[in-house]
């Protein structure tokens, strides 16, 4: 529905901002019910190297309160386009790179850094122009990341307990305890 339309809309804008274009498609899927309890809130699965399977971005719907509708656009930009799917697909499709660099070794800090940048790119290229609630979700996610920095300092310097850290995150971000 809306997330697929969102993905199509931002994909159409990508040539205006990037020379390299991902050829692999991405599908948005629900995390299978039988693994929901232990699965992350959202995650990405690479497209098959031979092109036989598109990339997939999975959303965990075990508790829809963890992912209110207004937060899904930013999660989608993070996981799909211009996020993980875009970055990983371009690497996989690159000519002349050894397989170990293009598809085998992933660097989490680089990939997550790119995905956070992708959220910002989406905002900068106007992805939220007609979606004020979606932009609110983007800003809430930025606040969440800033709050994690405070929590890190609280735990390591101020000797906060785990409970104090969670209480802070809930009070500042408005997220549910179960999502932290």
Segments predicted by a language model, with ranges:
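Long, His/Glu/Asp-enriched segments that create or flank divalent metal/ion-associated functional microenvironments
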Residues: 1-180
């Amino acid at each position: 529905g809306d997330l697929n339309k969102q993905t199509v809309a931002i994909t159409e804008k990508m040539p205006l901002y990037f020379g390299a274009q991902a050829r692999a498609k991405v599908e948005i899927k629900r995390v299978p019910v039988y693994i929901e309890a232990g699965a992350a809130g959202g995650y990405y699965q690479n497209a098959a190297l031979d092109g036989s399977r598109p990339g997939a971005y999975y959303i965990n719907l075990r508790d829809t309160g963890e992912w209110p509708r207004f937060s899904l656009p930013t999660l989608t930009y993070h996981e799909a386009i211009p996020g993980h799917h875009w970055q990983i697909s371009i690497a996989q499709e690159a000519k002349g790179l050894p397989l170990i660099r293009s598809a085998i070794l992933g660097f989490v800090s680089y990939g997550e850094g790119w995905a956070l940048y992708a959220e910002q790119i989406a905002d900068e290229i106007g992805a939220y122009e007609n979606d004020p609630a979606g932009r609110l979700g983007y800003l809430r996610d930025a606040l969440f990341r800033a709050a994690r920095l405070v929590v890190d300092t609280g735990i390591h310097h101020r000797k906060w307990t785990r409970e104090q850290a969670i209480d802070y995150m809930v009070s500042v971000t408005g997220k549910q305890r179960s999502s932290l």
